[in-house]
Amino acid sequence: MSDENTARHAECTVEFDGVDITSSIAPYLLSLSFTDNEEDASDDLQIKLQDREGVWMTDWLQKMIDGDVSAASSDGYKVGDVVQFLGGPHYKASTDKKANGKPKAGPAKITIIKQGALHPYHIIHTDGTSRVYGWVDASEISGKSGGGSSDSSSGSGEESLKIRATITACNWHSDGKDEALDCGTFELDSVVASGPPGIITIKAIGLPYTSQIRQTKQSKGWEKYKLSGIANEMASKNGMTTQFLAKKDPEYKRVEQYRCSDIDFLQQLCHDAGLSLKCTDGKIVIFDQQEYEGKDAVWTTTLGDKSYIKYSHSLGQAGTQYASCRVSYVGPDGKAIEGIAYVKDYDAKSKTNQQLEVYAPVTSKAEAKELAVKKLRLYNKYERQMSFTYPGDSGKVAGLTFNAEGFGPWSGKYIVKQSKHTVSGSGGYTTQVIGRHTLGGY
């Protein structure tokens, strides 16, 4: 609780590996931003610090980073280890996106380790079996000299630096009440120094690129599993939990995961089933957007009502607007199954109608039509979007719905695909909401 006579302001609490550093960073804090995404992207946290004296870059922060890098490198491999190269691409630099060839498999020696890099291991072939010479992914090496090999590579044995943050709006409505937003726990992703003037930007994300569930490629056949069961098993082995919030739980006789990370494979299964996935605060969350869109709007924003600071809207057509979707499948018995879904304002006479064609295994016409509806929604959902910047509001989070009125063709019901909460060093607080128009009627 705050004193009702206190000027409204926002505060943030920050912890590094469980140590409260709020008072340490307060004199340097420029801003703290928490981005909450609805699906297909990790939540992230960004902290900007002024560093005119170089205190953060050359002293305290450098020690923290060095400690983190040292810990993250203790993954069972070390410089000098001879490992089995599995035969994937190699790169000239640890940050390159374009491969420098794809040598065949063979033994190789680790010469440099840059844990956290896009391609963390530099290796050189040892006996001419392979001609690998360059940077490779963790998933492309396995086993040590004298040891066996496995189909998947191990990830980091130690955890990266964890950052936790909470935003508190103090006396925000002049009633003495405080409103807290727990941003969750994140792992250090990058540190950027820029200037002049000196600024340090610390970025942390909920599901780091270097995490095993995201980077380690696996091969496995899943027999007689439900989607929730696959998610639970993947979450458990990666130290996470699962929230399965969809009414329908697809079941698979057999589905193959081949040299694909757990999170990429799970995301593809969700998309194929018309479901959504997000990872946040150590949880894998699977839900049905159609169900969320059907919930009552939490608030209404009307043009000129002064509830917002600014707004923008966009209308996209290319690649985002299909009039119908057809799902078809020919079963082992030669029987053809087909289901078609249409947008709610479908005009059969229109010459501009585009139909999305999907070939997927289904067992009935009803199942085909249900999948067609979900695929149509997946491809059409970003046609109309609106963005509002409001005075700070901890209640405006991803997944909620709201109404926009008085905005012409952009009026209607929206679901929040992203909310960004930003606190300034002086105590200011804003919330930016990006919403996409809901797809009622199909």
Walk through the language-model features, giving the residues of each.
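Assembly/oligomerization scaffold segments
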Residues: 1-78, 146-205, 209
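Short beta-strand-centered interaction patches in the first periplasmic/extracellular domains
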Residues: 1-8, 199-210, 244-311
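Short, solvent-exposed secondary-structure boundary/capping segments
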Residues: 117-123, 190-206, 422-436
